Every structure is written in structure tokens, then in C-alpha cells.
Amino acid sequence: MLFEDIYTKHRDLRVHIDSPVAYNMFCNYFVKTLADTYNEGPLVIMCIGTDRSTGDALGPLVGERLHKVCKYAKVFGNLEEPVHAVNLEKVLDKVQSTYKNPFIIAIDASLGRSENVGTIKIAPGALKPEIGR
């Protein structure tokens, strides 16, 4: 199967939002990655960014929607209370002190090359700020 081949060869997925298979690839890869890495701790979704910086509002916009519909995870970061470079460490400390062994999913925008505009990337592991991980 194509998806299984992609997953076993690469530990991350990059797909353009305009691809006709983007939704299916994203969902399948996300579920597979979550199944392989989830530690059974409380689920925390960290939506990183700010609408005060051009190109950095993805996290807070997603967080705004997730706050309304997400019942099984604690969501940090939205338009009213963004999580960004200035307060990220403080928010992470709060998460670590509030939840025992949290499983954190991060949603963040990345500025990069023009040919990567519209590309979604899913990868296990930590975000590495300012290096386009």
C-alpha cells in the first residue's frame, strides 16, 4: 500500500494542501503517528503563533476552532490567549506542572521557501524553533 510505504520510509509527511489526496494522507499519517507515539498521558494541543506577525497566525486560528470543538484534549493558544516565543516556556511549565506526563501535539506555522507555501508537515518529535523542522 502506498501509505504504508511512505510511512515506513520516512518518519515525517509533507503534503500540499491543494493535493487531491492531502486530506486522506494527513488523516492516515496523523492517526498512524499518534498510534505509534502516544504515551497514554493527558492530551494537550499547543497552538503556537500570533496574529500580530504576518505568516504566524496558523496556530492561534486552529486553536480558536479547537477550543470550541475539542472535548478530549486541553488546548493552549488561540487569538485571545496566544502561545508564542515570549510566553512559550511559561506555558510549557504550566502544562508540565498541571498534567502528569502530558502528550503534547504542537501546531505551528513555518516561514520558509516559496515552493513550500501551502505544505503541511507532520513529524514525531520536538519542534525546533527557527530552523524549519
Regions found by a protein language model. Give the residues of each.
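N-terminal catalytic or cofactor-binding beta/alpha core of small enzyme domains
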Residues: 1-104, 109-133
